[in-house]
Amino acid sequence: MQITRRQWLQATGAFAAALAIGPRIARAAELKTVRFGIGQKAMAPNVINCVIGEVLGYNKEENFTVKPQALGGNSNVQVAVERGDVDIGIGVPSFGLPLLAKGEWGSAINYYEYTYPYKWDIVVKPGSTIKSYADLKGKKIGVSDFAGTEYPVTRNVLKSLQIDPDKDVKWVAVGNGVPAGVALDRGAIDALAYYDTGFGQIEAAGIGMQFLPRPKDLPMVGGQFLMAKKSMLKDNRALLIGFGRSVSKASRFLLADPAAGAKAFLEMYPETAPRGSSTEEAVKAVLVAIGRRIKLYEPPYPNAKMGSINAQEFKTEAELNGLKIPDYSGFFTNELIDTIDNYDVKKIQAQAVAYKR
């Protein structure tokens, strides 16, 4: 049985409610609650490797329980980390690097890259006359939100192709998930710039779209990170390591068996399953959403450890935006990676294969 567009709309509407309710699993009173800031308006499968450690037992092993908080936009997460309103948040260079260039980068630091480039694409309606990025001149490009990552990243890609993102195209905010696909389907926009899991939601709703071929020498920008206050490296180091290790383990779990990871996500947030769907159908919906994302959990660089940060990503993005940044040392650190990745990978893989919930 195929999931209908109505079912998927009901499911995406439930993501927000699920985030407010929180995962339906017992929380031990002695575990520290980690407030985790997410730069979107509702819970969605794109952060699956950051949250399923709760139900898989990885968080408990590190003596914490997670409380995700959807803060609406990535800049809001940045502010929340600085103010101490969240303990750990998702760091996005497109919002942090301009601050660093102006000498306004504050007390935060990126310490683990939980998803690597490149996860954005541009799609058009099937049969469109737009066949390449070069054909986008003079067109309306939709983005979910101007606070979303696809907006600054796609602007950078257009710049690399000598297309002026301010003069040569028009940008339109069309909403997250299925509404973005509907805008494309109805002709409100000529093309849609979005990220992998967002396209998965649109595909699951049965909306047709055609991916434009990616340009050659695509800039390796747009990785996303775990970010916390620098003071935590000293004052709460074990917590940062534990959260990073949970994300790393969850990433390995998903790579070993994506369906098992989808089941774990649905156990945490059963409200997100399409209404009236069977377990199999609900798992399929999550798998469609995360299918492209999972392979980006591993670094695309030779001999790099999972979660390690490559400074060249920041340098490339800074150059594309004309930012003068002489020193990136206060922006990120790899000092926790060896400890984070110190666990039995084969044990995690075996757990995924045996997962029968």
Predicted regions span which residues?
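Secretory targeting signals
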Residues: 1-3
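Short, glycine-/small- and polar/acidic-enriched structural segments
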Residues: 28-176, 180-186, 190-196, 212-220, ...
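N-terminal export signals
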Residues: 7-26
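Pocket-lining segment of extracytoplasmic ligand-binding domains
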Residues: 104, 179-276
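Secondary-structure end/capping motifs
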Residues: 236-324
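Conserved C-terminal helix/tail region of periplasmic/extracytoplasmic solute-binding proteins
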Residues: 311-357
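Short linear loop/turn motifs
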Residues: 67, 170-172, 279-288, 327-343
